[in-house]
Amino acid sequence: MSKKALLIICDGWGIGDKGKDDVIFNTPTPYWDELLKTYPASQLQASGENVGLPDGQMGNSEVGHLNIGAGRIVYQDLVKINIACRENTIMENPEIKRAYSYAKENNKQIHFMGLVSDGGVHSSLEHLLKLTDIAKEYGISKAYVHCFMDGRDTDPKSGKGFIEELENHLKTTGGKIASIIGRYYAMDRDKRWERVKEAYDLLVEGKGKQAECMVKAMEESYAEGVTDEFIKPIVHVENGKPVAVIEEGDVVIFFNYRNDRAKELTVVLTQQDMPEAGMHTIPGLQYFCMTPYDASFKGVHILFDKENVNNTLGEFLANVGKTQLHIAETEKYAHVTFFFNGGRETPFDSEERILVPSPKVATYDLKPEMSAFEVKDKLVDAINTKKFDFIVVNYANGDMVGHTGIYKAIEKAVVTIDACLHDTVEAAKANDYEVIIIADHGNADHALNEDGTPNTAHSLNPVPFVYVTANKDAKVEDGILADVAPSILHILGLKQPKEMTGKSLIK
């Protein structure tokens, strides 16, 4: 079996519950209905762990296109680290080994610093507790936690509970809380260096309100009307001296996995002296970031580096000499190029791209058609040349108009997509292309909340997989987004590379 293949991604076109909220079901779509009656169709899971996100988290366009093009589940940082902690593979991480071995062999302090909360945006309490477990396994007694309090992604007075939980855990692993400060100071991202200095002085010089009981110190802060985000520096003292400060040659692990609010503190500790602000880098620090914080940082270690997604569908087709076209309007152009190609900006050899400008309107309910018809016209022209072995197109309307929450506009968007599908698929059939129609996630399938108010978010619904083929015996199975690339290779008569762990859904 060796044909040409067209992949149509109808962005935000999920399979809804056929209730009032399901605009796709409630809007006349004669051509879409005909496709579903005529050709084999199944469902793809496009959210949560099926696309490398935390369980129950709705999919998005970036993650969706990454998985579609990669032909494998591409785990996001949080999930990747969660799996490493739960399956204990973190113990095999070479940078983890380096950090703990260095501290043990050189009798150095190891400092864990980061946001102590379960907000799940910047850090995970689970990761911190695991890091303290590893210190126990290595027999490191000089392990200290510097707690940045949240109150933005969590309740403003939830921090005391996290400190209690951490202290109870440290009773089993050893180690101590060394300091507490609000994220307002420790996690600034707007170059307010006077705030960062409050955190720096606490970490390096032990400057702050002295306390022997950290839970009591939190209670006192609340009593003064100061909540988690704004907690002033608190230093844990024993016999009148700080339990621990960061010293020359120590090990520091910054366990925030999101980079934006971890950069400034990392800069002043490791990258750049700021004498005018009274901050100097600490010599000889063994400094470990949970993920890459900034490509320009020198001399820091990264515990979980970005994966290179090799042998994506685009790269594989280029390597075997197949021609390909990636086409979309502005709003989704990065998705069918950069994300679809595994985070690569430049086109592969024999890859062509067409960008159609999105309409310049304030919100897309004002023009629900967007530039879909222009995309369709250019796409049909390209199909008629028979030049390309593989084409991927994104129709943006279901998602971008779905985000407005305006029901009538979403109806128009759905009608637009149905018309574009007709012209696109008929041209493909006339030129001997087989077609797969999918979505990257849901949106227009769930336009209302239960109380009837507009829902502007993505949905957790599965998405369609429709296989337009002349083969009357063809069947398709249910799957996940990672199964799309292997299915395209099946149409093209190519064996999928070992890096692709998805499977062809065409039987």
From Swiss-Prot:
Recorded GO molecular functions are: manganese ion binding; phosphoglycerate mutase activity
Pathway in which the depicted protein is active: Carbohydrate degradation; glycolysis; pyruvate from D-glyceraldehyde 3-phosphate: step 3/5
Domain of life of the source: Bacteria
BP terms from Gene Ontology: glucose catabolic process; glycolytic process
Q: How does it assemble?
A: Monomer.
Q: What does this protein do?
A: Catalyzes the interconversion of 2-phosphoglycerate and 3-phosphoglycerate.
> What is the protein's name according to its record?
2,3-bisphosphoglycerate-independent phosphoglycerate mutase
Origin species:
Parabacteroides distasonis (strain ATCC 8503 / DSM 20701 / CIP 104284 / JCM 5825 / NCTC 11152)
